[in-house]
Amino acid sequence: MSTGKVVQVIGPVVDVEFSLNDKLPDINNALIIQKDNDDTLTVEVSLELGDGVVRTVAMDGTDGLRRGMTVEDTGSSITVPVGKETLGRVFNVLGETIDGGPEFGPDAERNPIHRDAPKYDELTTSTEVLETGIKVIDLLAPYVRGGKIGLFGGAGVGKTVLIQELIHNIAQEHNGISVFTGVGERTREGNDLYFEMKASGVLKNTAMVYGQMNEPPGARMRVALTGLTIAEYFRDVQGQDVLLFIDNIFRFTQAGSEVSALLGRIPSAVGYQPTLATEMGQLQERITSTKKGSVTSIQAVYVPADDYTDPAPATTFAHLDATTNLERSLTEQGIYPAVDPLASSSIALDPSIVGEEHYQVATEVQRVLQRYRELQDIISILGMDELSDEEKTTVARARRIQFFLSQNFFVAENFTGQPGSYVPINDTIKGFKEILEGKYDDLPEDAFRQVGKIDDVVEKAKSMVTD
């Protein structure tokens, strides 16, 4: 392989010169810089400047680098371990373990992080709903197998618990695998998530990849590809349905923006990199269903200054199939999961995909909840007595629906003391249909809180009467 030397260091960007007689490394190749203390630094080729010089982005800090240091071309892009051995482990962008466990040997199976998206003839053409067992999602904003879902929510509204429950349900009901990718988020949150997942028993079905806030932009820019590469192996080689969590997709864009100017590119709108749409597309197009399996991605989306026209979230939205919005006002009412039934949406909520009955029940639930929201101002000012009999019935059913959208989670059993519930989609539709028909108008509202199926509501109501 070719050998060169460091000629310039500008923050996370390193220029490397090779002899004109040697073969220049390809774009996206990984180069290894030999540092003075027997340590090494991996950099990735981004540009060829001419005269044997390439411009690279460092995957770790460039402290201690100096001109003249030896650089070796590895001959390929960054490669990371793949396969069942990755489950239960935590990796960095280079596929090195960071959980204190044993390292992967040189004979471990590895794949390059830069790969082409599946070809058209490999894709599955059918749109299939992925059952999660979570009522509010399955009924009102169903996930598409191999789709991309945006998860919106502030701090403390239950994003982490919802993620854990999805990982648990996919593992238990679908024998599925999950890959969690922490992109540019707080190290403390990543640490907490690791120990919470260990305690709740879902870690054994999960591979975790972290490139957190304190790491150089090169690592944050590529760590999403590392997680995706691990997920693709489970899909393509083992025929699995994989859940890929990316938290936070905005940080992927932000990291690219940080190095773009240093690479010599002229900034585009709002200072973002001119290659924003291309970089996002290369990542998102690899997340899809093939005839072998699927990668379904749930991406936390940070919206800077709540500006949805900002190029970063706007570019992300173009790829999303569904959105799950978590609402703080629901947590204040003790409704978990705190998914906003009116703000959340999905392209799969279509009679040709979910069926006519599911579609009719879902739209009627949304209509009743929307009418209840409109009546709340009147109720708060004038009271319930000013409503017509029809409006009183609508309010009563809407409150029962709102409470019935909640349920106990398996991963929260240790905290709530209540057993979790997985609700099949047919039971979900049956329950809401019967509430809308008025079959349970005589049952107390509290019987609908934090239960699974509609039969559980009836049982809970009986026990409340007995007590």
From Swiss-Prot:
This is ATP synthase subunit beta. It catalyses: ATP + H2O + 4 H(+)(in) = ADP + phosphate + 5 H(+)(out). Keywords: ATP synthesis, ATP-binding, Cell membrane, CF(1), Hydrogen ion transport, Ion transport, Membrane, Nucleotide-binding, Translocase, Transport. It is a peripheral membrane protein. Its main location: membrane. HAMAP family: ATP_synth_beta_bact (MF_01347). SUPFAM superfamilies: C-terminal domain of alpha and beta subunits of F1 ATP synthase, N-terminal domain of alpha and beta subunits of F1 ATP synthase, P-loop containing nucleoside triphosphate hydrolases. F-type ATPases have 2 components, CF(1) - the catalytic core - and CF(0) - the membrane proton channel. CF(1) has five subunits: alpha(3), beta(3), gamma(1), delta(1), epsilon(1). CF(0) has three main subunits: a(1), b(2) and c(9-12). The alpha and beta chains form an alternating ring which encloses part of the gamma chain. CF(1) is attached to CF(0) by a central stalk formed by the gamma and epsilon chains, while a peripheral stalk is formed by the delta and b chains.
